[in-house]
Amino acid sequence: MMMMMRRAFRHLARQQRRPLSHVPESAVYGGPRPQDVGAAAGAGAGAGATRRVTVTTLRGKHRRGEPITVVTAYDYPSAVHVDSAGIDVCLVGDSAAMVVHGHDTTLPISLDVMLEHCRAVARGATRPLLVGDLPFGCYESSSTRAVDSAVRVLKEGGMDAIKLEGGAPSRISAAKAIVEAGIAVMGHVGLTPQAISVLGGFRPQGKTVDSAVKVVETALALQEAGCFSVVLECVPAPVAAAATSALQIPTIGIGAGPFCSGQVLVYHDLLGMMQHPHHAKVTPKFCKQFGNVGHVINKALSEYKQEVETRSFPGPSHTPYKIAAADVDGFANALQKMGLDEAANAAAAAAENAEKDGELPENK
């Protein structure tokens, strides 16, 4: 009997695992429970909504000239939305330091905190390719440390791949070592937020001949290191077009114009979650707000505040738990015996009001 129960438990666990793109489905993985993605939004989900997106999927889209969709998200609810919309890639970015935690830069966030975000996203998104950022300080010092950090992102964070910022030779070497360890890597060139100390702030790149050439050279170096894709951030459209043409791997643009292989925006930004993003004084010039969720949220919170202050919430329809009138009497008597006369009166008064509203069940 015990053996049968164990077999049944193992079968149930296998059904609940989220298959990763880089490990066989039969591998031991205590991953998150799959969501129902069969009813994914029609605008982009299509017939293949339930099929896992892999690096091979992206290569196929790139080969066919089909744009790749990427959204940066940081938690379970946003991951569920990204998943149901049929987005190709969900990137768990180190920009969580700014968007979620309120820092001025991406530098403060640690690998351990990033792993928490990765796990939350992995529980919510079962269809997209999941890519986790390597935060500043966890991969630059040596290839060994880079590989160790990347392994944690997959094993502990439940990601399919990692992203790292390119530029310095040490970062290119880190990318190469991680790929050689069997982990898919997405590169990142142009404005690399982890290097703002060198760049002098969040400034567009590729606006001079030398800077533009460096963007293309770095992208090519990341491709040579084995990256399956490269993010191009805040570079002029001609520079992004040149990099896209020069590379054999997909480019993902953010503030890089329409000539990239795909596009990425931050979940909070594209939804208009706030009047302006917390991590910017104004909405980034490259960010189109596809919604005005922030206005809806503010309106709902204001209405909640007003209804609480006027005592109109909660009303009868949101006070679902009942107690019979006879039990209220017994409860009041018990309170009086405890010397809590005012509490007994409060209970009786509440019951009387509920009875007027037809809330209180009849005595049995």
UniProtKB/Swiss-Prot annotation:
Cofactor binding note: Binds 1 Mg(2+) ion per subunit.
User: Mind listing the UniProt keywords for this protein, alphabetically?
Assistant: Magnesium, Metal-binding, Mitochondrion, Pantothenate biosynthesis, Transferase, Transit peptide
| Catalytic site positions | 233 (proton acceptor)
Q: Does the keyword Transferase apply?
A: yes
What CDD domains is this protein classified in? Answer: KPHMT-like (cd06557)
Provide the catalytic activity annotation: 3-methyl-2-oxobutanoate + (6R)-5,10-methylene-5,6,7,8-tetrahydrofolate + H2O = 2-dehydropantoate + (6S)-5,6,7,8-tetrahydrofolate
**Residue sites binding Mg(2+) per the record:** 94, 133, 165
Q: In which pathway does it act?
A: Cofactor biosynthesis; (R)-pantothenate biosynthesis; (R)-pantoate from 3-methyl-2-oxobutanoate: step 1/2
Location in the cell reads: Mitochondrion
Family indicated by similarity: Belongs to the PanB family.
What's this protein's name? 3-methyl-2-oxobutanoate hydroxymethyltransferase 1, mitochondrial
Species per Swiss-Prot/TrEMBL record: Oryza sativa subsp. japonica
Name of the gene encoding the protein in the UniProt record? KPHMT1
